[in-house]
Design a protein with these regions (language model features):
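ATP-dependent carboxylate-amine ligase
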Residues: 1-12, 21-26, 41, 62, ...
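N-terminal leader/targeting and accessory segments in enzymes
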Residues: 1-66, 70, 210-211, 230
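Short, charged/polar "capping" segments at the starts of alpha-helices
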Residues: 12-17, 35-37, 48-50, 116-117, ...
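Phosphate-binding loop of NTP-binding sites
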Residues: 36, 45-195, 247, 254, ...
């Protein structure tokens, strides 16, 4: 889009910085000297205006945006699509961007750190996060809502508070909202101005999924538009939740005049987002790195593994993310994890915002019969299985443990 970009972060490595390194975007450690005259400053969601670089920007009289404010500004500059939902945002944004970028001039920004900018885009596609109601900074032309499921208990009071946030968001959409009609709460949304299109497996949806077939390589499914076959689609995805997510992207592409043939060509080129069922194999085993950090996401990830690798043992290695979420969903986490054949738990990865340890991993172990605790690579001997899918799940830094486990088993 023509802007010169640099950024600052703490010294700890995180997987999203890899995309920045590939584009030669300068990254610095926090220092007020990083901020110069003439800069525009975007403040990440984890920080406030007391941050050392933000204070320097204010001293210089620079324009300071929150991430949501700046993204909202970008979405106003071109026809825009915002993808939101409690679960599946990143995957669905990736799917939608994949279709549109092969058929229209498209800019996009995805939660796994992936993005692309064009000066004169036909569309700007962005992942829209509900946390702290950040997405209320956006007034997109189109939106996808994958689901509404209570999360972020450190901010939202309950599912009704969360529903209210989503209702406020869809009220700001200008043209069309594509909503999962199967979802208990999302299906109740009533946009104030935009048209509503529904999708899902159930009868009555505008775009209905039927005749799902799954192999170890792909899933094949039909989509009916208003009870008439739109097309048969094939994709390298495996869970029913991902087929549902794909259907929302297909519906939005169809609404915008992209042909079924062009949609399928784009789906053939689809690759999963970072840390969304990322697979590595050794011997008879499969290692999966996945961002699942909510009970619903864990259950869906285990379901995907069973569908793709029927006959293999499923071992879940889970690192809870934040004390508040772990405490709120303690029993729900246990219930979802126990759909695996064996469960291992890692110490909780706390948020920088959390000041008090209100729950420990031992509390989750108590309600998860048969589970064991893994503290680090010194406990890898506990994972001595064959013909197994190892699911490393969590939103913290469990991906590092996952990669160390894979390296240990492939270094000889």
């Amino acid at each position: 889009m023509g802007h010169i970009v640099q950024g600052s972060d703490e010294e700890t490595y995180f997987f999203t910085q890899e995309k920045l390194e590939q584009r030669n975007i300068p990254m610095f450690y926090y220092n007020e000297e990083n901020i110069k005259e003439g800069y525009e400053v975007i403040l990440g969601n984890a920080f406030d205006d007391t941050h050392i670089e933000c204070r320097r920007a204010k001293e210089l009289g620079l324009k300071i945006y929150t991430y949501a404010q700046f993204l909202g500004k970008l979405l106003e500059e071109t026809p825009s699509i915002a993808v939101t939902g409690a679960h599946g945002k990143t995957t669905t944004t990736t799917m939608t961007s994949n279709i549109f970028k092969h058929n229209r001039v498209t800019s996009y920004l995805i939660g796994d750190g992936t993005g692309h900018g064009e000066k004169n885009s036909d569309f700007m596609i962005a992942e829209a996060c509900e946390y702290y109601r950040h997405f209320l900074a956006y007034h997109p032309d189109y939106a996808i809502v994958t689901n509404i499921d209570f999360d972020h208990p450190d901010y939202f009071n309950d599912e009704y508070d969360m529903f209210d946030a989503f209702q406020s968001f869809v009220n700001q959409v200008k043209n069309t909202v594509v909503i999962c009609g199967d979802d208990r709460l999302a299906s109740k949304l009533k946009p104030a101005h935009a048209k509503t299109i529904t999708y899902g497996f159930n009868d009555g949806n505008d775009y209905q999924i039927k005749n799902v077939q799954t192999s170890t390589e792909y899933s094949k499914f039909d989509i009916y538009k208003n009870n008439t076959l739109l097309g048969t689609f094939t994709m390298a995805i495996f869970g029913l939740h991902d087929i549902s997510n794909a259907t929302s992207a297909i519906a939005l592409a169809d609404i915008n005049g992209i042909s079924v043939e062009k949609i399928q060509e784009s789906l053939d080129l689809y690759r999963p987002a970072e840390r969304r069922f990322s697979e590595y194999k050794f011997g008879s085993n499969v290692v999966v790195d996945d961002y699942a950090h909510h009970p619903s996401e864990i259950k869906a990830t285990i379901d995907s593994a069973r569908r793709k690798y029927a006959g293999k043992q499923i071992v879940a290695i889970f690192q809870p993310h934040t004390y508040t979420r772990t405490a709120k969903f303690l029993n729900e986490f246990a219930e979802s994890l126990l759909t695996a054949d064996k469960v291992f738990l890692c110490p909780i990865f706390a948020s920088v915002r959390e000041k008090e340890k209100i729950v420990g991993i031992e509390d989750l172990q108590k309600v998860t019969p048969g589970s064991e605790i893994i503290h680090g690579e010194e406990d890898f001997d506990k994972l001595n299985f064959e013909n197994t899918v190892f699911l490393f799940m969590g939103a913290g830094n469990i991906n590092k443990l996952c990669h160390k486990f894979f390296e240990k088993n492939t270094s000889n």
